[in-house]
């Protein structure tokens, strides 16, 4: 137990009861696990400083000890309280960041010899058992809960573009005139069906209306001026607009037959 004897020697003049000796042992165990003492009390004070020694005034109240600690890398802070209840001491530890709590109850007579508080070699009884109980009852639970809270804490992540609903009023991506348009279309999310029907710019994607002329298969270009004596001026038909030519479309594949469905009641012989 390297360091405990040195700590005990520095605090020996202030150790006047069994609970003082137990808090001294608890402090040493916390420090050996990478913590520094900051000060006493629930709230930070102007005299706080990192130290491996017990802070000034650590045992002013023999019934309630309140110490604050900070991990060596500053990642976590502990609030340690030791409450004396008759011949027992209740140890309570709070980790500020995760708000995790651990507690342990110890019988003072099992680990402290009240008759030899001035002799380090005789003050502590069953020191290995005492150390094991502090580690398993306080240190390990706090560390495990802190690590678990950090691993399982939710991180806000936006879903990928393919899983988000497409905003029909968004501004289309800008492509300089000197560069070519990319040959691919933006992927649509599963909940964006029909969104293109609301897009006034009429991009290359389809909506909910079936358009055989835009089914994705190769087809001949349609001249919107077909059947007119003169050609339509440039820009008369917006790009991507659903436009029916004024006249026959020549050798292009014919459109859907308007009579491909039977009229209502065609099979009623009495109609």
Swiss-Prot record:
GO biological processes: negative regulation of proteasomal protein catabolic process; proteasome-mediated ubiquitin-dependent protein catabolic process; ubiquitin-dependent protein catabolic process
Keywords recorded for this protein, A-Z: Acetylation, Cytoplasm, Endoplasmic reticulum, Methylation, Phosphoprotein, Proteasome
Compositionally biased intervals (Pro residues): 251-265
InterPro entries for the chain: PI31-like (IPR045128), PI31_Prot_C (IPR013886), PI31_Prot_N (IPR021625)
Pfam name, any one: PI31_Prot_C
Similarity remark: Belongs to the proteasome inhibitor PI31 family.
Name of this chain's protein: Proteasome inhibitor PI31 subunit
Gene: PSMF1
């Amino acid at each position: 137990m390297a360091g405990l004897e040195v700590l005990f020697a520095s605090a020996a003049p202030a150790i006047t009861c069994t609970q003082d000796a137990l808090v001294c042992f608890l402090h040493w165990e916390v420090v050996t696990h990478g913590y520094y003492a900051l000060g006493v009390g629930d709230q930070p004070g102007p005299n706080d400083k990192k130290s491996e020694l017990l802070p000034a005034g650590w045992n002013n109240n023999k019934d309630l000890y309140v110490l604050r600690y900070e991990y060596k890398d500053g990642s976590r802070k502990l609030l340690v309280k030791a409450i004396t209840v008759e011949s027992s001491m209740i140890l309570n530890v709070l980790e500020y960041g995760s708000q995790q709590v651990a507690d342990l109850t110890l019988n003072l007579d099992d680990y402290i010899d009240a008759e030899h508080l001035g002799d380090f070699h005789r003050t502590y009884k069953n020191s290995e058992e005492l150390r094991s109980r502090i580690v398993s009852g306080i240190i390990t639970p706090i560390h495990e809960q802190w690590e678990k809270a950090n691993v399982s804490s939710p991180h806000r992540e936006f879903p990928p573009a393919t899983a988000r609903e497409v905003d029909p009023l968004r501004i289309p991506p800008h492509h300089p005139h000197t560069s070519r348009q990319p040959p691919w279309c933006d992927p649509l999310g599963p909940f964006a069906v029909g969104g293109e029907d609301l897009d006034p710019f009429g991009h290359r994607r389809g909506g909910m209306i079936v358009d055989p002329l835009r089914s994705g298969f190769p087809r001949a270009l349609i001249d919107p001026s077909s059947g007119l004596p003169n050609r339509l001026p440039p820009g008369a038909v917006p790009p991507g607009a659903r436009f029916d030519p004024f006249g026959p479309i020549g050798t292009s594949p014919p459109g859907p037959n308007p009579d491909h469905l039977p009229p209502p009641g065609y099979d009623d012989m009495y109609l």
